[in-house]
Amino acid sequence: NNEWGKAEESLEKALKLSNRHPQVLNYLGYSWLKYNMNTDKAAAMILEAYEKDPNDGVIMDSLGWVYFKTGDYDNAILYLEKASELNPQNAIISDHLGDAYWFGGRKNEAVFQWKQALSQKEEQEELNAKQVKNKIENGLKNIKKLSIQDEKIKKNLHSLNDITE
């Protein structure tokens, strides 16, 4: 939509002005993923943000979301669980973790996370509560998976150190 176009333009300017600040990289990359746009650039930006600030829960959520959107549910769960540990009151992270659990075959845990998301204060205004309630009632259907074309980005995603070590 037109509002997103203006926001995207502002974020790209902020990225240059901020010397590729991890929060700006993450926000623009995540926004592109959210709108199913520029998948390779989005993943590269989120990876760069993660390399610059690997202990930021919101950035870790975005990295988990890259894995989720590309169908790698095991790694999505790994990073989203860590993001949830770092930001235990974040409704969006709980919602994302619920989605990953659902497609990872962990249905009860998914429903628990979605219910958690509805009661959490942080990022509540960003949460689509009606959509989350629908997921609690009906689960999730198949989603459109995004694919990363750039081999270097794929390699970087697959070579990240296991965060559980």
Task: Name these PLM-found stretches.
Residues 22-31:
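Amphipathic alpha-helical repeat scaffolds of TPR domains
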